[in-house]
């Protein structure tokens, strides 16, 4: 195996940065007035994290009313636990090791299986960049299948399935029995477009999870070499998830930046992370990320394979790509984007497009097909890819290499031809019991978004859909987190299981930490809006709690319950910075005399007073009649 012919220049301070890599990057996760809570499963080592936001009391003329804590889904892992000791150089605790050992269908390999992995492990030039706590990789024993889909089809409920059932339920079954939550748990009926959305938290059971996985409608991306993972589920009949991208490039960003960006993404709520690195030290960057990631990590293996050829697509080979798959699988990558649906005969269909082929992976494979005038080797070797995937339980994210790059190209012949091929490949992967999700567009005008979901459900047999947006207009560079967030909320409502975030830098440059924050918050909004629209149990709880806090002028609770407490408070404090303003019954928008909510409260107080006066008069009238109705005695 040869080393890459070209690599980007890296910072001369990389080694020093790694040596100084802060142990407290994650300790800064001090969510305001929040508490980390663990929900206990059927065994001691199933401890499912959530965050509870504590609220202040409400003070009224009638006395004090306690407001209960609000549970929220938490992706921050140990970084959100104030009691945890975090050392990025040591990696995260291995919470799944006992589960893997007990199943008895994997083995610890004596060494790495990938030629390139072995080469990197013994290269003295990368010694200063290596994560030093690497353990030997696992692989399925000969004849064994270790995927969550395989277990589900055998009727087995794994600890991972129980974990995600508890996580999705968010103890709402318990709260629904408590009177203080009765009003807060009220919500509008959703429209699910035929999805099998649970109607009550009690229905979100480990058996329900198993059934959804067995049917192929959901996946738990959980590589057996990622024991640090806190399991999560991606499926139409569960909470809508979001993915955050990171990765260095040939022109900018360093290894340490990507590790910090990953941790930063978790703080704001990324459910999964895709490492899209295309620059130097891809292998080492990925190792640091996975060892410190409590969420699933996805990659596009063709990017690294291309780096190994010096960026020459024509030089790609099946053997090189196969070695890259094994290399990444043994590091612990949980899902691979594989552009196996870009077929030779589809490439000419893109000739009349306004923007042609915009997917990096799609363009790489299209160029290879044309250069060799042969069928895509990812398609012709698909069964062999499945054999690798099921040996490590890596999930497919079947790539949309022919997705539209502008709304003019949306829903065209080439896009849907590829989608239909992805359905064919889904069926083939399922015969190997390999988990599958389907990637989708892209750029689609709003009126044509639903058609994408309909086509995917029909031709890909309800495998989870994973979409990039879609962007519903092309006129807003710098604001594409908004143009795509609009499409994302809609397609999430229609049934998309996971939304890939878009940052303000889309089409313009590599995002920095603030861009990542903005992208994730925007997509948390879109996913939550979709959950509300499809009627996910308890989805409206946080909305109701925040609305109540707003009406009662509990400013601090408004900040705490928001998706971005820091930004909400900073915007408030720009005009009313005094501490007393946080208990004032008005804001700078209307002022004290014109606040609609303050006026409404005064009207209610007046009405209550009038009601009391009327009641008093009525009582006096009754007393007067009882005494004989005489004016003078």
From Swiss-Prot:
Enzyme class: lyase
Gene Ontology MF, one: 4 iron, 4 sulfur cluster binding
Cofactor(s) named in the record: [4Fe-4S] cluster
Gene3D superfamilies linked to this entry: 6.10.250.620, Radical SAM ThiC family, central domain (3.20.20.540)
InterPro entries in the cross-refs: ThiC, ThiC-associated_dom, ThiC/Bza_core_dom, ThiC/BzaA/B
E.C. no: 4.1.99.17
Signal sequence, start to end: none
Sites where the protein binds substrate: 245, 274, 303, 339, 359-361, 400-403, 439, 466
A Pfam cross-reference name: ThiC_Rad_SAM
Quaternary structure, from the entry: Homodimer.
HAMAP family on file: ThiC
Function of the molecule: Catalyzes the synthesis of the hydroxymethylpyrimidine phosphate (HMP-P) moiety of thiamine from aminoimidazole ribotide (AIR) in a radical S-adenosyl-L-methionine (SAM)-dependent reaction.
Protein name: Phosphomethylpyrimidine synthase
Lineage of the organism: Bacteria, Pseudomonadati, Pseudomonadota, Betaproteobacteria, Neisseriales
Gene name of this polypeptide: thiC
